[in-house]
Amino acid sequence: MKILFTDLDDTLLNNQSEVSEYTKEVILRMLECGHRLVLSSGRPLGSVMEVAKKAELFIPGVYLSSNNGSCIYEIATDNIIYEKTVPMDYVKAVWELGKSAGIHIQTYSNTSIYSPALDDEIEFYTRKIHLPVVVSERPWEELEREPYKLLAVSLNDRDKLEVLRNTILDRFSDKLDAIFSSDRYLEIFNRTSGKGEGLKWLCNHLDIDIKDSYAAGDAMNDLSMIEAAGNGIVMCNGVGALFPYAQIITKKSNDEDGLAEVIKEHILG
């Protein structure tokens, strides 16, 4: 049995944010052969579920690793089987850092986004992530449980996010990590989680040898799982800094079924 962990945006999904029919056919063939699929994303769980259902991949044999590996959901049993959260004291501290720096910070429940305002950043974000928005200046007082992550968003100024990242790592590196998933998005989550930690935990849970694991991605928040997997796959359209860590670089982009070709050659071949 082999297991494929794949990022969504710019990896599994094409430029229309869809799983192409061809890629879906290849994935279903992979599942029919007894292999496993993990949709591994920085997105919140509700959004990953939406992608899986739209692609008709909300089926046994598929797992959803959301919030950068902080939450793993098993479709077959309808259960969250693994989770790492951010303590509320740290939610408050990061939120207030963002406010002081004039940076949009948001956080999540499994079904909603908590945003400080209905601003340009949340309007941009919800074009792709279709979850309801709760406007809140103090989400740590309103959330029913600790969140899996926070997200800092700056639409036009990555440098501001770099400064925030350095501040978070200087002050809270005992508990938090902060990694870019794009030039606009800084992911902030429990330092003991991450896509790579989620990969290692699930392989152990399913008794699958790491050498039989594959991880595909395109951005820096995919690095930990690309390194952790027995076979790291980087999309040819991915950031150049990832290429040295890849055992496999796709010949085609996410918009040309690049991942499907790798599945056919390396998992089904």
Each PLM stretch: what is its role?
Residues 1, 34, 61, 147-148, ...:
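Short, well-ordered alpha-helix to beta-strand connector turns
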Residues 1-3, 20, 187-269:
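Mg2+-dependent phosphoryl-transfer enzymes with acidic/Ser/Thr/Gly-rich catalytic loops
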Residues 1-6, 25-28:
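Non-catalytic pre-domain segments flanking phosphatase-related domains
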Residues 15-19:
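Conserved ATPase-coupling elements of RecA-like P-loop NTPase cores
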Residues 21-122:
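Active-site phosphate-binding/coordination module
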Residues 30, 41, 68, 150, ...:
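Residue-level signal for inorganic ion chemistry
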Residues 97-216:
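Conserved acidic, metal-coordinating active-site core of Asp-based
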